Amino acid sequence: MKKLILISGLILMVSCQEKSKLDPNINPFFQDWTTPFEVPPFMDIKNEDYMPAFKKGMEENLAEIEVIIKNTDEPTFANTIEELERTGKLLSKVQRVFSNLASSNTNPKLQELQRELSPMLSAHYDKIVLNEDLFNRVEEIWNNRESANLTKEQQKLLKDTRKQFVRSGALLNDSQKKQITEINSKISELSTEFGQNLLAETNGFELILNKSDLEGLSDAVVSAASEAASQKMDQAESEDEKEKYKDKYVFTPHRTSMYPFLTESTRRDLREKLYNSYVMRGDNANETDNNDIAVQMAKLRAERANIMGYKTHADFILEENMLKTPDEVYDLLIQLWKPALKRAKAEVADMQAVADSEGKDFKIAAWDWWHYSEKVRKDKYDLDEAAIRPYLSLDNVIQGVFNTTNKLWGLNFKEIFDIDSYHPDARIWEVTDKDGSHL
């Protein structure tokens, strides 16, 4: 099974194995967490805890904003910008847990909540960034920044805060703000649906093979496919479903399963089938088709950009990037495109030569790329990816990362076992600096 690593930033830092001690009759999000570094007490959190916590978090957040707005003192960095940074603690507490689980260890109930919450959260944040009274306080501080004796860090925070308000529509009139709020809510809803459709199609396809279909596959790849089939058997709810996976081998569009198969399998028909299952996700004219969603999102983004005073969505997004305009992006892409295309054609020619030498009567297609590029690599450089793979096991890669960070920055890692996590395969490390202190 694909291993899961519980990470906060790079690694979740914990320093002891203290267990959660929560009142089971009270929502876990409404209690102080006594776990190391306030690690979420995953075993105590139930799906039904999220919505009440989100609602209370949003209520508290708006109440905190109202306190800032009603402050009769002259707006200052301390009573407005700093206070704004302190708001939303409960909401952030809930959202950090929910967002991570919804993306890494989801279930139908979490997905249902995600669809319900997306427009709610979008509307909530718009209530803050489009609040005229709040923005007026921020704007007054911005206009008086030269005489405020702010540190560089405070200047940066003030600039970023104002920019967030402006780019969210704070300078628009009331009618435009209403339009932006409606558009943001719809985009949020569509974006969630798009992602869930993509996940459903990724998880929904299985290439179930017999032993006779495994031509060219290494022992490691075969073993992983056999284990995947065994896991499917364990999860099966009926005898007929169990029989479906008995003595079989399963490959999926997940890259860790797909790439080794595309590289090693000599069965071109099966390579094509698995490859197409990946590239056609969301484009199968079924209940999880994303074509109409993509069109709707593009139109809404364009409409929002126009309301904000930009020609296109690309112009709006690029304003915050190194390249500021679509023309600058296209110019850079053209510079890269020509040499990249030349190199790609040369690589295809090398692959085609190998296929021709084997007596094949087809032109190299997308699903052939991994297989024949590996053969070219072996012929030209005597480099066998299958021979390297045992050295790149998960544990070896993790240890390599830890050794590198230790050499560069003196960080030390100690795996912790006696702490609750969100999944049985999750692994947790304590991280300390070279002097033994926690970061």
Question: What spans do the regions from the language model cover?
Answer:
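Positively charged n-region of N-terminal signal peptides that target proteins for export
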Residues: 1-4
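Sec-dependent N-terminal signal peptides
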Residues: 6-9
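C-terminal motif of bacterial Sec signal peptides marking the signal peptidase cleavage site
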Residues: 12-15
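Sec-dependent signal peptide cleavage junction
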Residues: 17-19
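N-terminal helix-rich structural modules
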Residues: 21-225, 232-234
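Short His/Asp/Glu-rich catalytic/ion-coordination signatures at enzyme active sites or charged loops
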Residues: 34-49, 98-117, 139-182, 250-292, ...
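Charged, low-complexity, helix-prone segments enriched in Lys/Glu/Asp/Gln
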Residues: 57-66, 113-128, 187-198, 206-208, ...
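Active-site-proximal, well-structured secondary-structure segments within enzyme catalytic domains
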Residues: 157, 186-189, 196, 200-251, ...
